[in-house]
Amino acid sequence: MRRRPPAPTPVPFSPAAARSHRAGLGLTPDQVVEGMAAHGVRLLPMHVLGWETGEFRPSEEEFIALARALWCPPAQLMGAAPAGLRDFRVARELSQDQAAQRIGVTLRAYEHAELTGKWGGDAGQTYALGHVLGIGLRMLVRVTNRQEELDRCLRQCVDGRWQSQVKPVARLVPVPRPVLEQTLAEFQGEYLVPMHWGSAPSQAEQRPVLPHAERFWELLSAHRTDIPV
């Protein structure tokens, strides 16, 4: 017997936020479902009440229609900041197919990324992913499970030549090449502490105490990037 595919994880949803937004607009559950019907989702008022009490949770399509009916950004109904690709996509009111088309990857590739948290796109596709879903650079590295890869590149930048790490880091952090080159040069320069025979480095010459990635993001944030850090 063929196994059924696992049910999708429910969209993050705050019943209290839904109640608050509806009350703030002075809408009845009947009026909310009328508004949702205008966006192609037809339900009964009991569904709205069930969501608000936490009895059950809306599907992606229902969640987006509810946000539109309540005239609020979907993220405000989540109750927490988006934590994965699916959350960011839903916050942008996009289906998986719409996201894949705008990013420039196949639907299958995008579905795999959401399911596994592993992203295999090149620098251009990674830029499109962050731009389309509204993900900052630091979070983009995190939700695509590329933090270890970035850490490895930064260690190699410290131990070797920063120039050799421009291309691999560009796959992970989609910023203009001149900006990335300058940032990596600054980053490596902070670790090239001059040493003098018979003396310890002065306080001004001490290496940065922050983890490599934290210092990299600090340096990068001082530059202008299309996608915010």
Located regions from the model:
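A short, Lys/Arg-rich alpha-helix, primarily the initiator
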Residues: 1-25, 72-92
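Short, charged recognition helix plus adjacent turn
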Residues: 78-101, 142-174, 223-227
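Acidic (E/D-rich), amphipathic helical modules within compact regulatory domains
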Residues: 29-80
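DNA major-groove recognition helix of helix-turn-helix/homeodomain DNA-binding modules
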Residues: 59-76, 123-141
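Helix-turn-helix DNA-binding elements, focusing on the entry/boundary residues of the two helices
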Residues: 18, 29, 45, 63, ...
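The alpha-helix within a helix-turn-helix
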Residues: 22, 33, 37, 67, ...
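Charged, low-complexity intrinsically disordered regulatory/assembly segments
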Residues: 157-229
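Short alpha-helical DNA-recognition segment
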Residues: 26-49, 93-112
